[in-house]
């Protein structure tokens, strides 16, 4: 077989698309790809002063009387303000930094040294508070977040100080602890303010993700404090680990018997919408009688399914809970209430530490139609178990009694 040549630019093209998928978590990868590459094509047709896709729309929102820029519609209040597009410089029309390292999310990271900036307990607390609402950190597990916090460093800024300048190479991602900052964009030799940050938020990720020069200038309008994360650590932990987690989810979903009948594209849609939750030993995951909002697949650990007995009482005089099922890795629970549109028929408890993949009810109804017959058959299976346990056919469809 002849050697297959990879066309120049293909790797970078696919990396850019992959990074944007990881950032935005679109529900449909095909539709998102069409939109992404259409924008990219249109951007390349523009003049030399055009800017490359994926264009990121920043929404000006009012917060304490000061407009705050937040990415991709993640707003805290409704606003009719016009969308402000902050241009992202094109790597096809500008020279990319010669010192910016090539990045592939699939490469191994075992030999990558961890960056640690020592912090006092007081600094660590302030950093955790500043980072708690940062969108890019939401999908990190505890270990990944700990690595990020270890690697971040404090930067004190003064009024009128330029934190980053449009056109410069990206070196750090910044999280705002305090202070106000203007966002300035220069185009056609004219500089204008496109928004502000007011004591919260983050900036600087775009240049690190796309290996492009800074898209805007950030100027402090008051004294303040920032937490910085260097480019290498940012890309290694946030981008690469998210890519690896996606692959892990893909592999795990393929191993779940319930999904065997699904097409590959259908399984990939499931991967796009699932989240991950961790439960401690004895922690209650779902509660009998409550409204159902999620479906659970056990990624690791064991889960005990219990139902309140109508004949047995506990030491407090209430209905005693009796185990009717014990679930392991790859098994699922919580589907019954979603299939029947009834309250939870049983409670579920973690046995030891448990990690679950979680899908909300909207995604469940949208994506698991082909699996519905299998799950409905489980209703009769559960009833058989109850007959064996209690000697009667309890009504699973009325669990709140």
Swiss-Prot record:
Binding positions for 3',5'-cyclic AMP 2? 258-401
State which tissues express it: Four types of regulatory chains are found: I-alpha, I-beta, II-alpha, and II-beta. Their expression varies among tissues and is in some cases constitutive and in others inducible.
- N-acetylserine PTM sites in chain numbering: 2
Xref: Pfam families: cNMP_binding, RIIa
A single MF term (Gene Ontology) = cAMP binding
| GO cellular component: a single term | nucleotide-activated protein kinase complex
PTM Phosphothreonine: at which residues?
212
Quaternary structure, from the entry: The inactive form of the enzyme is composed of two regulatory chains and two catalytic chains. Activation by cAMP produces two active catalytic monomers and a regulatory dimer that binds four cAMP molecules. Interacts with AKAP4 and CBFA2T3. Interacts with the phosphorylated form of PJA2. Interacts with MYRIP; his interaction may link PKA to components of the exocytosis machinery, thus facilitating exocytosis, including insulin release. Forms a complex composed of PRKAR2A, GSK3B and GSKIP through GSKIP interaction; facilitates PKA-induced phosphorylation and regulates GSK3B activity.
Q: What's this protein's family per the entry?
A: Belongs to the cAMP-dependent kinase regulatory chain family.
The name on file for this protein is cAMP-dependent protein kinase type II-alpha regulatory subunit
Taxonomic placement: Eukaryota, Metazoa, Chordata, Craniata, Vertebrata
